[in-house]
Amino acid sequence: MFSDAIRAVILGIVEGVTEFLPVSSTGHLLLAERFFDLGSGNFWNTFTVLIQLGAILAIVVIYFEKLWRIALGMFSNDADRRFVIGVLAAFLPAVVVGLIAGKYIKELLFNPWVVCFSLIVGGAVLMWVDQLDHKPHEHDATAFPLPMYIWIGIAQCLAMIPGVSRSGATIVSAMLLGADKRAAAEFSFFLAIPTMIGAFAYDFYKNRADMTTDHLGIVAIGFVVSFVTAIVVVKAFLSYVTRNGFTFFAWWRVIVGTLGLIALALGR
């Protein structure tokens, strides 16, 4: 239906748009592959992991000054050191659960039905949290208390279920724990860096035999498209949610999940 280059562009756009929005990039990629013949098989499964690095690079570029300052100061500045420890503490639960249960989660839950139900349920939760009488007391993503970082990391484990959304789980948990909307979103971005690099390294090592030099051009296309798209989306997303909240994204999830269920019921 599509050439490999067009598939790479479309999947790169889907990844760049959805990775940092609370709508589940994995869920959208699985549905795109299912309904639009955008590639399946070991190479394309690995491809969707590889292009996440483009989205991660976008976060590094956007927050480079802050991340560089923290990297330089983590051995001499208590606040920077606490933040690095907090990110690592939030990252650790996903490592443990992924190593123990990741294989079984992929075998049992990586299907379009689970994605659609997760999108709908997650949308309802996001809408509920967004409409709470929220009185935030944490306004700096780099200065949350350590227990808060740990709880956010535990919540992130729910995102191993396709359709839940890593950013959605971390943003919702951060807001319930007292973060304002912008701080919740920003910490979700920061936590994505080690989480997604770890997922990439693990999946790439397992599936390295499926990659050849013939694939480099296709991967490069997806990587660049994902990077450029993510830069635009992240900047717009922060501005939007600070003013308007997350209701739009909650409805997005519900609508996509419902349309997906209808398509599946009709035999697509």
From Swiss-Prot:
Purpose of the protein: Catalyzes the dephosphorylation of undecaprenyl diphosphate (UPP). Confers resistance to bacitracin.
Miscellaneous note of the record: Bacitracin is thought to be involved in the inhibition of peptidoglycan synthesis by sequestering undecaprenyl diphosphate, thereby reducing the pool of lipid carrier available.
Top-level class of the enzyme under EC nomenclature: hydrolase
UniProt KW Cell membrane keyword: yes
Protein keywords: Antibiotic resistance, Cell inner membrane, Cell membrane, Cell shape, Cell wall biogenesis/degradation, Hydrolase, Membrane, Peptidoglycan synthesis, Transmembrane, Transmembrane helix
Source species, domain of life: Bacteria
EC number from the UniProt entry: 3.6.1.27
InterPro entries with a match to the protein in the record: UppP
An annotated Gene Ontology molecular function: undecaprenyl-diphosphatase activity
Family: Belongs to the UppP family.
TM spans (from-to): 43-63, 83-103, 109-129, 144-164, 184-204, 218-238, 246-266
Membrane-related topology note: Multi-pass membrane protein
GO BP terms, alphabetized: cell wall organization; peptidoglycan biosynthetic process; regulation of cell shape; response to antibiotic
Localization terms from the record: Cell inner membrane
GO CC term (a single one): plasma membrane
Main location: membrane
Catalytic activity field: di-trans,octa-cis-undecaprenyl diphosphate + H2O = di-trans,octa-cis-undecaprenyl phosphate + phosphate + H(+)
Protein name: Undecaprenyl-diphosphatase
